[in-house]
């Protein structure tokens, strides 16, 4: 009996010790900056232009938008007047609160004005790539139930079927003196009808913070593109997390000229550039597309202070000898986002912009901004090369084990999860995909693998589904790509998995050689394989002209895997 009691006591004690060893709470990471008050009860346009109303300190006569293509300038007063007129014009055509308007436009002042007008009306903008094919446009327009499409004259032929189905087409052309002329296309409404509408005809709509304001399309962590419902509250929160407060994480000021050649239909340019610039009273220099010499000429002419980039753009700056011909000394911030920038590229671009603070940010369409370098803060922190920043203020982040879901401490890699008011409301008409992405506790699972170091800085290792499994070992493509790009005869590279009967998967490389290079497969394999452990060695190399990438700069690995499958089946 005594022995049984002792055994019971020892067993109970061991169980208690085991319970004490298990983590009793999540490892949750927050910003080094204190949380701030965010007025996310306001409609988006009220918030963005708050400094120009009431007791605000903004000067409406200052420059808001510079059209890089024509030199046309719009002041903050011009932008707000046009916003209200276009909203009234859209309303006159039958668009109401909650209706969806597709913006099928390249970077232009009209894109910005249209987005703001739709938001002011309480309607929803779904943004689309103007280079989409007719079927791609139709698929998004129908899935989003768009009632109107605002586009350019040269794109109208892609919209014939939609026009026949009753979708209103508003058309602009940028060949006129003022940047917009009437369309002569039958069945299309001229954009000038909107800009000349009587704003007094529209009573300001009542907008809830939970109303959807933007609906870009994203594949998320997997699957087909889905409509991402971003609310007024979510977008206001995402902007404020970056640029509001006494010590903003991203210190844009009214004296800045912010360059925008990254596509405005993508959330990065829309949120972190266009709307953040307007919130702070800065000037936004809009360029239709990235052309290296034109961009450098505009930097010199307008004394641009902020240049946001993506990895392909950084590569262009690094590899071009033309950079020496231009005065780029006005640039004080170079912000890399949309895709993780390798340390080798970061170090190289610093030499081209000697006066610029360089750092990275990290986010996704569904989550808003997740992290931002504190090197950009008004009172900056020391940061490490290669880090994508620290978690944004007024938000929480954790790193979870991909197998168990248990949260991990510092310096342990796992899936990055984020929680906060900046998150999307969900995917349009897809509750299952929403539930897979945002769990019951409100954590959005990004599908990105990373870790938080001892200084709260975040490092992205790879994408969850992009990891290569070699006999159970994890191989990160990003690591091998960094090595490949460091070779002087390689312009760009991507690594994907190839099926293998013995190892399950092996890494293979697609390589874009420098012009005139005679680099061979053996040269590439030798260069990489001598620098990595055996299971990370490149097994095959395929030479191609260009690495396929999305407009965001992310490698289109699905395309490369399909190409690999075709080549291996021959």
From Swiss-Prot:
Which key words are in the record? ATP-binding, Ligase, Magnesium, Nucleotide-binding, Phenylpropanoid metabolism
Q: Which pathway does the database say it acts in?
A: Phytoalexin biosynthesis; 3,4',5-trihydroxystilbene biosynthesis; 3,4',5-trihydroxystilbene from trans-4-coumarate: step 1/2
Which Gene Ontology molecular function entries are recorded, alphabetically? Answer: (E)-caffeate-CoA ligase activity; 4-coumarate-CoA ligase activity; ATP binding; trans-feruloyl-CoA synthase activity
What the entry lists under PROSITE patterns is as follows: AMP_BINDING (PS00455)
Q: Where does (E)-4-coumaroyl-AMP bind?
A: 268, 338, 360-361, 365, 465, 469
Q: What catalytic activity does the UniProt entry give for this protein?
A: (E)-sinapate + ATP + CoA = (E)-sinapoyl-CoA + AMP + diphosphate; (E)-4-coumarate + ATP + CoA = (E)-4-coumaroyl-CoA + AMP + diphosphate; (E)-caffeate + ATP + CoA = (E)-caffeoyl-CoA + AMP + diphosphate; (E)-ferulate + ATP + CoA = (E)-feruloyl-CoA + AMP + diphosphate
What InterPro entries does its record include?
Answer: AMP-bd_C (IPR025110), AMP-bd_C_sf (IPR045851), AMP-binding_CS (IPR020845), AMP-dep_synth/lig_dom (IPR000873), ANL_N_sf (IPR042099)
CDD domains, per the entry:
4CL (cd05904)
Q: EC number(s)?
A: 6.2.1.12, 6.2.1.34, 6.2.1.-
Q: Which cofactors does this gene product need?
A: Mg(2+)
Which parts of the sequence bind CoA? Answer: 289, 471-472
Q: Which portions of the sequence form the region SBD1?
A: 291-360
Domain of life of the organism in this record? Answer: Eukaryota
The UniProt annotation puts the region (SBD2) at 361-427
EC class: ligase
Binding-site residues, ATP: 218-222, 226, 360-361, 365, 448, 463, 554
Enumerate the Pfam families for this protein.
Answer: AMP-binding, AMP-binding_C
Family from the record: Belongs to the ATP-dependent AMP-binding enzyme family.
Q: Which PANTHER family match?
A: 4-COUMARATE--COA LIGASE 4 (PTHR24096:SF359), LONG-CHAIN-FATTY-ACID--COA LIGASE (PTHR24096)
Q: Its biological function?
A: Produces CoA thioesters of a variety of hydroxy- and methoxy-substituted cinnamic acids, which are used to synthesize several phenylpropanoid-derived compounds, including anthocyanins, flavonoids, isoflavonoids, coumarins, lignin, suberin and wall-bound phenolics. Follows a two-step reaction mechanism, wherein the carboxylate substrate first undergoes adenylation by ATP, followed by a thioesterification in the presence of CoA to yield the final CoA thioesters.
Q: Domain comment?
A: Both substrate-binding domains (SBD1 and SBD2) are involved in the substrate recognition, and are sufficient to confer the substrate specificity.
Protein's name in the database: 4-coumarate--CoA ligase 4
Q: Which organism is it from?
A: Arabidopsis thaliana (Mouse-ear cress)
């Amino acid at each position: 009996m005594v022995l049984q009691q002792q055994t019971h006591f020892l067993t109970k004690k061991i169980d208690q010790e085991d319970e004490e060893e298990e983590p009793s709470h999540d490892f949750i990471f927050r910003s080094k900056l204190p949380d701030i008050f965010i007025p996310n009860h306001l409609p988006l346009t009220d918030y963005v232009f708050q400094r120009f109303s009431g007791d605000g300190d903004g000067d409406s006569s200052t420059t808001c938008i510079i059209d890089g293509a024509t030199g046309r300038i719009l002041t903050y007063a011009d932008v707000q007047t046009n916003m209200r007129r276009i909203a009234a014009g859209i309303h006159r055509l039958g668009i109401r609160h909650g209706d969806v308007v597709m913006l099928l436009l390249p970077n232009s002042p009209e894109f910005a004005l249209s987005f703001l007008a739709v938001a002011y009306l309480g309607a929803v903008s779904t943004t689309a790539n103007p280079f989409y094919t007719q079927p791609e446009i139709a698929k998004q327009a129908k899935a989003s139930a768009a009632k109107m499409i605002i586009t350019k004259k040269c794109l109208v032929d892609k919209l014939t079927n939609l026009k026949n189905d009753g979708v209103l087409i508003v058309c602009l052309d940028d060949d006129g003196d003022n940047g917009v002329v009437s369309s002569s296309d039958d069945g299309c409404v001229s954009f000038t009808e909107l800009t000349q509408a009587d704003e007094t005809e529209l009573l300001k709509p009542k907008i809830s913070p939970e109303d959807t304001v933007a609906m870009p399309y994203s594949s998320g962590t997997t699957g087909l593109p889905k409509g991402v419902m971003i609310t007024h509250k979510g977008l206001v929160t995402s902007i404020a997390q970056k640029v509001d407060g006494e010590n903003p994480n991203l210190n844009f000021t009214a004296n800045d000229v912010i360059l925008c050649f990254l596509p405005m239909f993508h959330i990065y340019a829309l949120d972190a550039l266009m709307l953040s610039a307007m919130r702070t009273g800065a000037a936004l220099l809009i360029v239709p597309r990235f052309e290296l010499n034109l961009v450098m000429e505009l930097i010199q002419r307008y004394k641009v202070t902020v240049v946001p980039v993506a990895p392909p753009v950084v590569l262009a700056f690094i590899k071009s000898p033309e950079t020496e011909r231009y005065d780029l000394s006005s640039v004080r911030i170079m912000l890399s986002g949309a895709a993780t920038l390798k340390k080798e590229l970061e170090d190289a671009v610093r030499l081209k912009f000697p006066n610029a603070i360089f750092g990275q940010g990290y986010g996704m369409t569904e989550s808003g901004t997740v992290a931002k370098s504190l090197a950009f803060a008004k009172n900056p922190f020391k940061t490490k090369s290669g880090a994508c920043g620290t978690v944004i203020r007024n938000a929480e982040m954790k790193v979870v084990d991909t197998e168990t879901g248990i949260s991990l401490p510092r310096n342990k890699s796992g899936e990055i999860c984020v929680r906060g008011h900046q998150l999307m409301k969900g995917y349009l008409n897809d509750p299952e995909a929403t539930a897979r992405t945002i769990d019951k506790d409100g954590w959005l699972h990004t599908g990105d693998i990373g870790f938080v170091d001892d200084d709260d800085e975040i490092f992205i290792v790879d994408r969850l589904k992009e990891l290569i499994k070699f006999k159970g070992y994890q191989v990160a493509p990003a690591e091998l790509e960094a090595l490949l790009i460091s070779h002087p005869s390689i312009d760009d590279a991507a690594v994907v998995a190839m099926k293998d009967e013995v190892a399950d998967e092996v890494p293979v490389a697609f390589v874009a050689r420098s012009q005139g290079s005679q680099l061979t497969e053996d040269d590439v394999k030798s260069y990489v394989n001598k620098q990595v452990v055996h299971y990370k060695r490149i097994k095959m190399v395929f030479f191609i002209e260009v690495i396929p990438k999305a407009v965001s700069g992310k490698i289109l690995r699905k395309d490369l895997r399909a190409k690999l499958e075709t080549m291996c089946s021959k």
